[in-house]
Amino acid sequence: MREGERWVVLGPNGSGKTTLLSVASMNLWPTTGSVEVLGERYGRTDARELRRRVGFAGSAIEGAMRPDLTPTTLIMTARHGAFEPWWHVYEDTDRVRARELGARMGLADHLDQPFGTLSAGERRRTSIARALMPDPDILILDEPMASLDLAARELLLADLEALALESRPRAVLVVSHHLEEIPLGFGHALVLAGGRALAAGPCESVLRDDILGEAFGLALTVERHDDRWTARMRRRS
């Protein structure tokens, strides 16, 4: 990914998406090859410091959040990469930023509720606001639309579209199973299958019937209407 680019990673279950994210976020050591993140070579730099420049949000992060803590606290603790508020000292500016990020992600009316009482969409928004707390250079979102209903999905898509227009984070990567979940402003795509990349580049050249059909093992029709992508199985004649 280059500065200013917004990428989507697509592929079926077992294609390697989670493994790729784990390596890119420096939580899994590669068995072969080399990895460079923000100009630093993995293994030749302090991964703990570099991780602070990579924001990560997904269901695994949400599962580690204490249900009795509020979104404000859970967002704020990301300032030090923690989940508990007891081990670090926080300034008033940290609390203000946490509340601003929460409000920006549509949580203004829920910032003081226990996390465990939030809806799936509100939990997802908390996770994303938390990932933005350290002002990362790269933001990685692992299936941000998973388990959301239609309204929650569309509202979150609109927020991610607004985020894509901003200068920070410098690059954003979203992982998904569905073309319908690609936000506007995401202009590049990587398609994985069987642990390898089938295609990578501008969406127009990658999101094609043949490439996605090979990835998912189906005859697909890929279309684009009003800048939103869709894919459906081709009917048998």
PLM feature spans:
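Conserved catalytic motifs of ABC-family nucleotide-binding domains
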Residues: 135
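H-loop (His-switch) and adjacent beta-strand-loop-beta switch element
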Residues: 187-202
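Helix-to-loop junction immediately C-terminal to a conserved catalytic motif
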Residues: 25
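Catalytic Walker B motif of ABC-type/P-loop ATPase nucleotide-binding domains
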Residues: 139-143
